Amino acid sequence: MKIGTQNQAFFPQNILEKFCYIKEMGFDGFEIDGKLLVNHLDEVKAAIKETGLPVTTACGGYDGWIGDFIEERRLNGLKQIERILEALAEVGGQGIIVPAAWGMFTFRLPPMVSPRSLEGDRKVVSDSLRYLDKVAERTGTTVYLEPLNRYQDHMINTLADARRYIVENDLKQVKIIGDFYHMNIEEDDMAKALHDNRDLLGHVHIADNHRYQPGTGTLNFRRLFDQLRDDRYQGYVVYEGRVRAENLPEAYRQSLAWLRTC
C-alpha cells in the first residue's frame, strides 16, 4: 500500500527539509497544501528532484467552496483550484481533494435551516464540478470529491452521495476520495462502501475513529486495507489527522510502522 502524509506542525518549515523529513520517516508521498505549492512552486520542484519524494495530491489552499453560499467566493475558489491543478501538473501530482464545503453549514446545529434549497445545492455543486472536470482534463489531473460527515457539511456525506454527482454529471476527471474518519460516522459498513464504489475510488484519507493517528483508536484498518487490496486499489492512502502523544514524531513513526503490518 502506498502511504503518504499531509503536513504536521512538528515537520520542518523549510520546504526541502520538510521533504527530507517526510521521506526519512518512511512515507511514500506528500499531500501538499495547495497554496504552499502555488506560492513556492520552484522550491517544491527542487525538493522533489533532490529527495525523489513525490507530491501525490493537494488538499486545501484555496478560498471559497465549490458549494459556497456566496457566489463570488465560489467563483474565486474555482479559479484558485484551477491554478493549483495547473501547478500539480507541473510537479507530476495526481489531483486535488475537494469537498462541497467545510464548516459552512450543518442541519445538525442551529439554525438548522439552510439559506439555499437542496435543489440549489445540487445545481451549484454540479456547475462547479463540471467546470473543474474540464480543467482537470486540460491539465491531466483529477478532482477527488470528498464526502464529509454531517457535522461539517450538509451536501455530500457518503461515498454514494459523491458517486451520484459524478454519474449524473457524466464527469470523466472526478473520482471519489474515501476518508476513514468521515466514513466511520456516515457509512453503515465502511468496507462495503469502499467495495461498492471501487470503480470510482481514486484516493483515501486515513485517521483513526477519534481523528488521531492510526493504531490508537478503534477502527479495523486491517479489514479496510484487505478490502482495498481485494478491490485492487492502486491509489495512495494519506494520513490526515492529529497526533496525540508526548513524543509526536516518535508516535507518528510508530503509527506508520504499525500500519505497514495491516
Language-model regions, residue ranges each:
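Glycine-rich, proline-tolerant flexible connector loops at the mouths of alpha/beta enzymes
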Residues: 31-50, 100-107
